[in-house]
Amino acid sequence: MEGTSFHQASNSMRRNSSVWKKDSGREIFSRSSREEDDEEALRWAALEKLPTFDRLRKGILTASHAGGPINEIDIQKLGFQDTKKLLERLIKVGDDEHEKLLWKLKKRIDRVGIDLPTIEVRFDHLKVEAEVHVGGRALPTFVNFISNFADKFLNTLHLVPNRKKKFTILNDVSGIVKPGRMALLLGPPSSGKTTLLLALAGKLDQELKQTGRVTYNGHGMNEFVPQRTAAYIGQNDVHIGEMTVRETFAYAARFQGVGSRYDMLTELARREKEANIKPDPDIDIFMKAMSTAGEKTNVMTDYILKILGLEVCADTMVGDDMLRGISGGQKKRVTTGEMLVGPSRALFMDEISTGLDSSTTYQIVNSLRNYVHIFNGTALISLLQPAPETFNLFDDIILIAEGEIIYEGPRDHVVEFFETMGFKCPPRKGVADFLQEVTSKKDQMQYWARRDEPYRFIRVREFAEAFQSFHVGRRIGDELALPFDKTKSHPAALTTKKYGVGIKELVKTSFSREYLLMKRNSFVYYFKFGQLLVMAFLTMTLFFRTEMQKKTEVDGSLYTGALFFILMMLMFNGMSELSMTIAKLPVFYKQRDLLFYPAWVYSLPPWLLKIPISFMEAALTTFITYYVIGFDPNVGRLFKQYILLVLMNQMASALFKMVAALGRNMIVANTFGAFAMLVFFALGGVVLSRDDIKKWWIWGYWISPIMYGQNAILANEFFGHSWSRAVENSSETLGVTFLKSRGFLPHAYWYWIGTGALLGFVVLFNFGFTLALTFLNSLGKPQAVIAEEPASDETELQSARSEGVVEAGANKKRGMVLPFEPHSITFDNVVYSVDMPQEMIEQGTQEDRLVLLKGVNGAFRPGVLTALMGVSGAGKTTLMDVLAGRKTGGYIDGNITISGYPKNQQTFARISGYCEQTDIHSPHVTVYESLVYSAWLRLPKEVDKNKRKIFIEEVMELVELTPLRQALVGLPGESGLSTEQRKRLTIAVELVANPSIIFMDEPTSGLDARAAAIVMRTVRNTVDTGRTVVCTIHQPSIDIFEAFDELFLLKRGGEEIYVGPLGHESTHLINYFESIQGINKITEGYNPATWMLEVSTTSQEAALGVDFAQVYKNSELYKRNKELIKELSQPAPGSKDLYFPTQYSQSFLTQCMASLWKQHWSYWRNPPYTAVRFLFTIGIALMFGTMFWDLGGKTKTRQDLSNAMGSMYTAVLFLGLQNAASVQPVVNVERTVFYREQAAGMYSAMPYAFAQVFIEIPYVLVQAIVYGLIVYAMIGFEWTAVKFFWYLFFMYGSFLTFTFYGMMAVAMTPNHHIASVVSSAFYGIWNLFSGFLIPRPSMPVWWEWYYWLCPVAWTLYGLIASQFGDITEPMADSNMSVKQFIREFYGYREGFLGVVAAMNVIFPLLFAVIFAIGIKSFNFQKR
């Protein structure tokens, strides 16, 4: 079709290369002989005669070397090696090769006069608002959670007004993003950058209110599909960890398709044939391969891997929390590449450089620039800290702050605009850094250039208004006033199809990916098989046929118990779908919203592909247990049971997938899952007989899948030959009599009804899963919290809010209220090694140790700020961990002294602080509480409360945290503080310990220029108080680098190559390296840190033939440093070694009190855990109360007792299971904080464990009382004080047992995922041995011992013996009293209650003690 696009002559290209030099267009390979040319010409002539469809799928593949064969190939069968060789020929080494390839593609398109589509994005008077809670109401406390829930409900009914306040994110912004020009989006955190990018890409959250207009080529967003026309590349790296980088790209490419590239190629081939033009064979294959949908080996995938520098890790797993994979920087590039492989024509990229070094960022941005310039692409990219050379690649700049656009237009005029406002960029300052700081209240004054006028703070609003009258602003206003001529929009520019490829291809790709993931997760399936095998073995040996009779109705109860447990085993086996589905949801939401595929395409493959697994799991269960237990020997009945269990397994899998999609996070889904299981379980006909179900709950009986499964499996068994013996005085068989007595449906056809119903549930739940995926979005979006302040000046309020700081006094050196002793640290010939990794031994390495630090020397002094630098892998963090005593493994040699005395880690921990790169804090406390807690535990006992409080206030001012004192810390990337605020909190938490020596690991990583400046100002303030501070730092800007006094530079392999002062404008450092022969001189204005790392690489060493470590050791500087080390290694006259009478600052009791204080706030402000558990308990109590209404007092028949026991058994098992499952993620988060705090010497493990255990006791007590009161009254147990107390006591003990078991499982395993998998096996065994499914007297003698080890068995013993053990009334269907019956049938004696009560205390105590031992003994953090 005329004029369709190769759009982007490939998007692929979309990113590629370097600076511009147009290629002359000569062919890549000149043929070595006329014969080769003739052969190629003949093959090309044959190709030209083919029909268009076939011609576009064929190409001429030339050999890599002269004289090689020339083959005609099918593009869709292009192999991996062919693709690799093709790209090697097209893109040789060097950035400009990418650019040359793009020019060749463009030249081929231009030669036949095809116009490529372009997109101009305009936004006019765009305003975006959110509704947020204000002040203290925004904190997620227990009370607020309940209030907010009630408010939302009442507001929906229009009974109360909305209490949320409007918060403007973007305030009336307008602008144009033009094709063919690279646009950079700059602005401080919370300025609205991400919101603007989302609005322009058509991906804004529906809850946000948007006014104004966004158009593409003059067309409104409703006239095309913006999600497929534009690609939004987000900040968060959301990927499937079990896929490799290449697979991630390949599937993304297959889902997105090729857009209009194929149509463009058709038109291109037609025109070339008409004009008799023969294209370059390699370029021809490249373009055809990029334009062919559905390829498994995609040229685009390999091309983007090459551009992004990901070839080195192409076949490495992406990885996640559980699976080791690629680095953070590589993951960030995968996020970018995933969209670049698609056909989108406009790119909106959000902070794509986080975690990347400046040279990698430069290469990626340069490649994008080449694509944008050559193919007139549209790109708006936000970057955090662009280096000057990267900044200069952009044509246009959009500067945004507080939701207002301050500048938008050519990069060349941006400095001019600020000069008209009176601000000047200093000579050694990057323009990007200047732009981010000049709007900040804290930083603006230093750039004021009008010395004749007094400085006053210029607000963002004033900048925005001034820009409207600036010549660039006026020009943009004029352009926006003229509407875009829609007739000039290329027909292929805007995508109108919802999905990139046809339904058939989408389904095929989705099946392929799901099958791959199932293979990668095969361990889960093997584990489940193993678990089923163990449970099947336990079941068949517990219900052994020699012990089982078929003579009475009591025998029928045992067979019912066995069948019920087999059903439940397969039901619980489906629970693993919950966590596996939730783990993949973030990727699904991202790809669904980007219109990769509809929800049903995602949900269909796991359903169909897991059917064979259901057959295998059911086979494992049925064929092992059937004959050993002694079910009816008919083979037909065996296979009928097998089919039923297959359907049961499928139903459970579908149910838990649906629950996962409805819940969307583990805590909520676990709660939903437990609730669904409870309803189905309690109303399934086993726990509560159908005849006793109240009329208001009978609907629950008829919708319970377990009811259909149970009735079908019982009909299959009890209508068999084994149970056909007639009962005395009755015409009915034993089987029918038993079914009727227990309230089951006594008809053989119920097998077929049950089977059909289960099949229906499988379809229904899978349909529900698909609906939930289609209409629900992910939970937990971060929201702004507005401070509750008088809004007399709205601008001022907004300014304070976005700055996150208020103006403090001038930064002067200051003393602190608490004195401290300055200390120096020296290290001489420090060697650190680890055991040789197994993979290196397998590759033939002879040594048994790998040396990471090779005899490093240095001294860090008070009042001196030292930068610890080096390339990746040089050993920066390793050296810091060794000096700080944070290493948990390896071998350390050498001398380390503190003020001349040998270092002792226990005393050193008291005078040092360590700011880790990952900011680990308890998420549910405020900033102020975090500091109070740290100071409480780390300052000496002599410091009283008032002094401590004053000191905390001083530290908060020093670190600029005063305005954030009541802000909740939150979880990184999810809620609470921003990255930069968390970084300052990390520093403050260490400072309130009043340390003499502070280590900081990457304090500025992941921050924008303004935030980095705030953190560095904090660090500088800290040094100016006379402390010794050492920072590792990665790719700093000039002003950050030159804020340091000294540099400690390591090269790869762990050797120092420069240790000394930087000097004014880094002169000492520059002079040192420039004195080495062959080193390139630094250019004017170039960053000395970047230059220093570039000239000291291993490749430079090889080129110059020198060893920089040896050069340093031969220098005067080294000799001076050795003298300094020698001097500082001698104790000062009259000084004493560090001595503290106790290991920790505070007593054991104080440690316990402080830990408990923090846990109190952590629990109070964690409503997803505490409030949901509370509400869940009330819901379950009301449900049970109404289900078992007034059944507690009925003891006339066995079924009456069975019903009462069922209510207890179900509550103990399910509420307990819910407690254990929900506590595990909470303990797991806090354990990570514990590792940091214990390493800092804040407390011993026991006070922490005590607090974690003790805080649960009141919460669980309230849970037990609430549950007990509601249920006891509604079920109608006997109202005596003793019986009510026993009931509460045993329920409380049971809840505590499960809660502490859940905590113990986390303490003994690396994370809560593994803990939950291990726990599920125990829950199944406890269920089996609880005494409900098979009473203790009926158990084979070889299993009776385990009954006494089962905590659930003791709880049920206590509950039933205390309620019914004293009732001497005779039963209607037995010649025994209630007391005799429960003693004979269940083995329960009232006189044994004292022992039972003791065991009810011992189990929680045992699990709590094991939890404490686990926390103390196991450290799963490897350093």
UniProtKB/Swiss-Prot annotation:
GO MF annotation list: ABC-type transporter activity; ATP binding; ATP hydrolysis activity; ATPase-coupled transmembrane transporter activity; efflux transmembrane transporter activity
Binding positions (ATP 2): G870, V871, S872, G873, A874, G875, K876, T877
Catalysis performed (reactions): abscisate(out) + ATP + H2O = abscisate(in) + ADP + phosphate + H(+)
Pfam families in the record: ABC2_membrane (PF01061), ABC2_membrane_7 (PF19055), ABC_tran (PF00005), ABC_trans_N (PF14510), PDR_assoc (PF08370)
Glycosylation positions in this chain: N16, N376, N729, N895, N1375
Signal sequence residues: none
Biological-process GO terms, alphabetical: abscisic acid transport; abscisic acid-activated signaling pathway; cellular response to water deprivation; defense response to oomycetes; import across plasma membrane; import into cell; intercellular transport; lead ion transport
Xref: PROSITE patterns: ABC_TRANSPORTER_2
Region of interest (Disordered), residue spans: 1-36
Activity regulation information from UniProt: Inhibited by glibenclamide, verapamil and vanadate (ABC transporters inhibitors).
ABC transporter domain ranges (all copies): 154-427, 825-1077
Sites where the protein binds ATP 1: G187, P188, P189, S190, S191, G192, K193, T194
One cellular component (GO) term of this entry: plasma membrane
Domain annotation ABC transmembrane type-2: ranges: 505-718, 1150-1364
Induction text: Circadian-regulation. Expression increase during the dark phase and decrease during the light phase. Induced by cycloheximide (CHX), sclareol, and heavy metals such as Pb(2+) ions. ETR1-, EIN2-, JAR1-, NPR1- and EDS5-dependent induction by incompatible fungal pathogens (A.brassicicola), by compatible fungal pathogens (S.sclerotiorum and F.oxysporum), and by compatible bacterial pathogens (P.syringae pv tomato). Also induced by phytohormones such as salicylic acid (SA), methyl jasmonate (MeJA) and ethylene. Induced by abscisic acid (ABA) treatment and drought via a WRKY1-mediated regulation.
Biased composition (Basic and acidic residues): 20-34
Family the UniProt entry places it in: Belongs to the ABC transporter superfamily. ABCG family. PDR (TC 3.A.1.205) subfamily.
Function: High affinity abscisic acid (ABA) transporter that mediates the import of ABA, with a preference for (+)-ABA, through the plasma membrane, especially in guard cells, and is involved in the intercellular and intracellular ABA signaling pathways leading, for example, to stomatal closure, thus conferring drought tolerance. Together with ABCG30, import into the embryo the ABA delivered from the endosperm via ABCG25 and ABCG31-mediated export to suppress radicle extension and subsequent embryonic growth. May be a general defense protein. (Microbial infection) Involved in resistance response to the pathogenic oomycetes Phytophthora infestans and Phytophthora capsici.
Protein name, UniProt field: ABC transporter G family member 40
Organism whose genome encodes this protein: Arabidopsis thaliana
